[in-house]
Amino acid sequence: HRVDRRQRQMCIRDRVTDGAHPIYPTATGNLHHEVELVCAIGEDGDIIGWAVGCDLTRRDLQAAAKDKGRPWDAAKGFDQSAPCGALTLGALPDPAAAIALTVNGQTRQSGRLDDMVWSPVEVLEKARTLWDVQPGDLIFTGTPEGVGPLVPGDRVEAMVAGLSPLSFTVRPR
């Protein structure tokens, strides 16, 4: 499908560190995964490092909000909604680096960073127009095609070539 580059959905997230296992959230029957490159903001306000993240989305709540023209905050911003791997300090990974996600060993998402609609720098520039970006902030930068559902017990492996991978199991409520 075609993406309208004029519109961007941004939201505040609750991060889960690598090794932690998020609990399947309340108020949904349709939790989805979205592997993303995450940028970390340093003391000077610039990007100082990178990590692999997984944007967890209550897709049924998102669809209902879209239908009513409402924000997606309840669909995106919930406890443990943003598992994030270990931070790697330094320059942006190779723009042609692979980004992928598997669920129970089956590939669900596979792409390259240069296939993204917006570059990490563009995402950061837009975030700065909406919020006071602070040192320590983590900004998720978008996902390749192939997002899909998760259920309790699913084992998720997410990766961006050159970065520490992210692994977690969705725990039942």
Predicted regions, residues:
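Single conserved hydrophobic/aromatic residue that forms the stacking wall/gate
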Residues: H1-I12
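Short connector loops at helix/strand junctions that flank enzyme active sites
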Residues: R5, H32-E36, D46-I47, D79, ...
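Acidic active-site catalytic centers that drive phospho-/nucleotidyl reactions
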Residues: Q7, E34-E36, D55, N104, ...
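A short, compositionally biased micro-patch
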Residues: C11, E34, A161-L163
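Conserved double-stranded beta-helix
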Residues: R13-D14, Q80
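Short acidic (Asp/Glu) patches
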Residues: V16-V35, K66-G69
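RNA pseudouridine synthases
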Residues: E34-D60
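Catalytic-pocket segment enriched in acidic/His residues
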Residues: A51, R59-R173
